[in-house]
């Protein structure tokens, strides 16, 4: 391959930048630079985590052949992590699904049949029959959908509209329930609005970074490279990392803290106490902008009502709170002394004091980052509320370099799962199904009869598993996730429901995942740039991309599947007469007609697409579907602090952070001069709350749902590794990533291994009260658990670690605690 001088310099610049950030550049990234003239390039956000890195996608002869970091992308500035560099290869696994597959026996569907190729017509015929039978016999509560924070914005919007307005079922929930639900409820309780008030620009202006249950070095490596650059360029910048085990982020930490599982609640209250005792409360900010409330306690663990822990709880699932005075709050946190905190957490006193001093120092700009360590927690909402307390006490919020920041793990957990409202209790723009006014807004905008959207909250993720097992949920459509592997307590609740002959399970996926192979019908799905899409990242940045290639075989996008399936239902088959009588003109029409082919959605003509621009869905329907859906959806947030820009602006930008008002994005919300919704003279206004004030909550320590005992004597924490994303359904099909980390291992302290006669490399049986897996002992390497705890990643389909985990959830957010259950080890 011949390189021009310009191409050679560009290739070396990429390599040098990556090396400076501690990132590697694989050969595929270097090789593409010299082929620029032969390759067509276009922009897209990365397919993986919630960071939202921009990439340039190279296509040639109908295939993605190359990928490189987009130097014009403000998030990553031309860099990619190791997964981002291998994006092209996720598309072309040898077992890519290209046609629908139905379990069949003797020529027809059978629950115990073999997967057999069928046409889309046949697949939809079976789905139609199953949906209509369940709707007729049991009603809307008998059908459900489990979606994704990887859906594009219009896919999630179409799914929510089809289920909540079309089928009149709120039994739709995203896999973001497993990762971001606690953050959502935490934001709503404290601020009355979802999502962070800051942005990634804070990194270059902060004086201190505190990571709470977040291994950014591996899970958000591009952001970590920016933090690393900030830390190494200024000796006064400090980094504190808190976790239940040591990991790669500890390598940069000035204060690396390993605490006893669940005791982060104690540390948070101790810091609040320290701030008050050392007169570090920002009195002016606190007096003007904060209210105090005492939350209900002893709220249970989100288990079945028959579980002993739920029976014993005084206030199961209670979100109640009552006003309290500052003196009462001061007395409440005063119980969390330094001595008590050190004893309960196992953290040395000097480390606790150093941490508290970062927050208390009025001259230090502090950012708190967290991910699953906080959120996947039976008191995850409380943990979110308690870290907000620290920033509200000190006024370190909504200003450059200051603020609490919940990081997301999926590319559109914010943009789709949260903003669109694909949760079982939500509607677009932070509205909820239980609020009559909110339902009325949606019904009028969608031009459907009043009362169409049910007022009852639907089944959340774990409740869906239980309802399937109990035979109450009978038709279940899973899209863009691998929950059979990723969800908790596989043996006891999920697998029995999926294989119950009363139930029919559909999985839409590009690959034969554990979930797909456990289903009754598999629908082959288009991936990433095989469709036009939009994601919303962790800093409220909405990013668009165009379809750049066609999907293989008969694979279709989730959007196509939803819209085309809606044609199978007439309004009379899904809506009662009481609704139809309000709008008799809708009789005889299909759900496609009343939801997706409406004047509002279909008004943008195909002429808005360039002649050679791929867009399979729109060209098949005859109008610009994605634009119609987006503009209809964006209406909900405009003028209400969730403003999205006009559709076309996003194709011309590297993303925009909402609220976007008069063409200008917002970096810092709630503060005067930064947020267009805060008027001159107001200083700060937390306008999600009626009085414009945020809330500090008094919430205590409460123990985990399950702790080690004499038989199951070790804590188990689960999570990810750098090389693989979630269940590995994409990354394990990339040979280089698979070789880098080919199978899951059990990270264990050397002394715990020695006490059990285990050595590095030994096979070991890991058992809990719910199941067991066989794994490999690892006493060295990147993760270093303390004695009494083991860590396992969940990417390996041959080691289903979620056979072990407990389906306990935060009672407020319904998010599963994947970080704490009890296990034992035995040599194999």
Curated annotation (Swiss-Prot):
SMART domains: Molybdop_Fe4S4. The gene is napA. Belongs to the prokaryotic molybdopterin-containing oxidoreductase family. NasA/NapA/NarB subfamily. Mo-bis(molybdopterin guanine dinucleotide) binds at residues 83, 150, 175, 179, 212-219, 243-247, 262-264, 372, 376, 482, 508-509, 531, 558, 718-727, 802, 819. CDD domains: MopB_CT_Nitrate-R-NapA-like (cd02791), MopB_Nitrate-R-NapA-like (cd02754). Keywords: 4Fe-4S, Electron transport, Iron, Iron-sulfur, Metal-binding, Molybdenum, Nitrate assimilation, Oxidoreductase, Periplasm, Signal, Transport. InterPro entries: Asp_de-COase-like_dom_sf, CT_Nitrate-R-NapA-like, MoPterin_dinucl-bd_dom, Mopterin_OxRdtase, Mopterin_OxRdtase_4Fe-4S_dom, MopterinOxRdtase_cofactor_BS, Periplasm_NO3_reductase_lsu, Prok_molybdopt-oxidoreductase. This is Periplasmic nitrate reductase.
């Amino acid at each position: 391959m011949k390189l021009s001088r310009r191409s050679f310099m560009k290739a070396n610049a990429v390599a040098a930048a990556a090396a400076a950030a501690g990132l590697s550049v694989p050969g595929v990234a270097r090789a593409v630079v010299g082929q620029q003239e032969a390759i067509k390039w276009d922009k897209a956000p990365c397919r993986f985590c919630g960071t939202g890195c921009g990439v340039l996608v190279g296509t040639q002869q109908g295939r993605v052949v190359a990928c490189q970091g987009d130097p014009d992308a403000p998030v990553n500035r031309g860099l990619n992590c190791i997964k981002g560099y291998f994006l092209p290869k996720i598309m072309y696994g040898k077992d890519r699904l290209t046609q629908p597959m139905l379990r069949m026996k003797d020529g027809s569907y059978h629950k115990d049949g073999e997967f057999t190729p069928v046409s889309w017509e046949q697949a939809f015929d079976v789905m139609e029959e199953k949906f209509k039978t369940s709707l007729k016999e049991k009603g809307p509560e008998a059908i459900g959908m489990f979606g994704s924070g990887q859906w594009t914005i219009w896919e999630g919007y179409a799914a929510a509209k089809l289920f909540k307005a079309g089928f009149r079922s709120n039994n739709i929930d995203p896999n973001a329930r497993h990762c971001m639900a606690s953050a959502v409820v935490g934001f709503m309780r404290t601020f009355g609005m979802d999502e962070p008030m800051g942005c990634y620009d804070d990194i270059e202006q902060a004086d201190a970074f505190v990571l709470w249950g977040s291994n950014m070095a591996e899970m958000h490596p591009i952001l970590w490279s920016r933090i690393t650059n900030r830390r190494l360029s200024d000796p006064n910048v400090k980094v504190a990392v808190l976790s239940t085990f040591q990991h790669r982020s500890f390598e940069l930490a000035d204060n690396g803290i390993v605490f006893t599982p669940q005791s982060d609640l104690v540390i948070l209250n101790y810091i609040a106490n320290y701030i008050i005792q050392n007169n570090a409360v920002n009195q002016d900010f606190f007096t003007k902008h904060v209210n105090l409330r005492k939350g209900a306690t002893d709220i249970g663990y989100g288990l079945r009502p028959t579980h002993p822990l739920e029976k014993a709880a005084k206030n199961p699932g209670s979100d109640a709170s009552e006003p309290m005075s500052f003196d009462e709050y001061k007395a409440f946190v005063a119980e969390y002394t330094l001595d008590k905190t050190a004893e309960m957490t196992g953290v040395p006193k000097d480390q606790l004091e150093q941490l508290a001093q970062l927050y208390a120092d009025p001259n230090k700009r502090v950012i708190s980052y967290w991910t699953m360590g906080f959120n996947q927690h039976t008191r995850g909402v409380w943990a979110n509320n308690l870290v907000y307390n620290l920033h509200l006490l000190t006024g370190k919020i909504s200003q450059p370099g200051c603020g609490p920041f919940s990081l997301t793990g999926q590319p559109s957990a914010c943009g789709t799962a949260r903003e669109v409202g694909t949760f079982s209790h939500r509607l677009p723009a932070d509205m909820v199904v239980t609020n009559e006014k909110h339902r009325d807004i949606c019904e009028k905008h969608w031009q459907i009869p009043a009362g169409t959207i049910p007022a009852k909250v639907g089944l959340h993720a774990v409740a869906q598993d239980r309802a399937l097992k109990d035979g109450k949920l009978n038709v279940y459509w899973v899209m863009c996730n691998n929950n059979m592997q990723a969800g908790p307590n596989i043996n006891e609740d999920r697998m029995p429901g999926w294989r119950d002959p009363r139930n029919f399970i559909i999985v839409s996926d590009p690959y034969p995942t554990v979930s797909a192979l456990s289903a009754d019908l598999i629908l082959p799905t288009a991936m990433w740039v095989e469709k036009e899409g939009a994601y919303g990242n962790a800093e409220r940045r909405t990013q668009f991309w165009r379809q750049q290639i066609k999907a293989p075989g008969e694979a279709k996008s989730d959007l196509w599947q939803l819209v085309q399936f809606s044609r199978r239902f007439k309004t009379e088959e899904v809506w009662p007469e009481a609704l139809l009588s309000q709008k008799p003109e809708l009789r005889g029409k299909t759900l496609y007609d009343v939801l997706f082919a409406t004047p509002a959605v279909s008004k943008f003509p195909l002429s808005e697409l360039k002649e050679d621009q791929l867009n399979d869905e729109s060209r098949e329907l005859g109008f610009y579907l994605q634009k119609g859906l987006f503009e209809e959806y964006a209406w909900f947030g405009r003028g209400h602090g969730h403003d999205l820009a006009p559709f076309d602006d996003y194709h011309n930008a590297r993303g925009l952070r909402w609220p976007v008002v008069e063409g200008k994005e917002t970096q810092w919300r709630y503060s005067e001069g930064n947020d267009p919704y805060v008027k001159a003279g107001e200083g700060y206004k937390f306008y999600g709350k009626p009085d414009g004030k945020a809330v500090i909550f008094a919430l205590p320590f409460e123990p985990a749902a399950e702790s080690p005992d004499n038989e199951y004597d070790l804590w188990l924490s689960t999570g990810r590794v750098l090389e693989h994303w979630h269940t590995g359904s994409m990354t394990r099909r990339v040979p280089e990533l698979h070789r880098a980390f080919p199978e899951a291992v059990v990270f264990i302290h050397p002394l715990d291994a020695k006490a059990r006669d285990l050595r590095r490399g030994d096979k070991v049986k890991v058992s809990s009260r719910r199941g067991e897996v066989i794994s490999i002992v690892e006493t060295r390497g990147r993760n270093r658990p303390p004695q009494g705890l083991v860590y396992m990643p969940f990417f390996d389909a041959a080691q289903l670690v979620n056979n072990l985990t407990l389906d306990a959830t935060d009672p407020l957010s319904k998010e599963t605690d994947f970080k704490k259950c009890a296990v034992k080890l035995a040599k194999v």
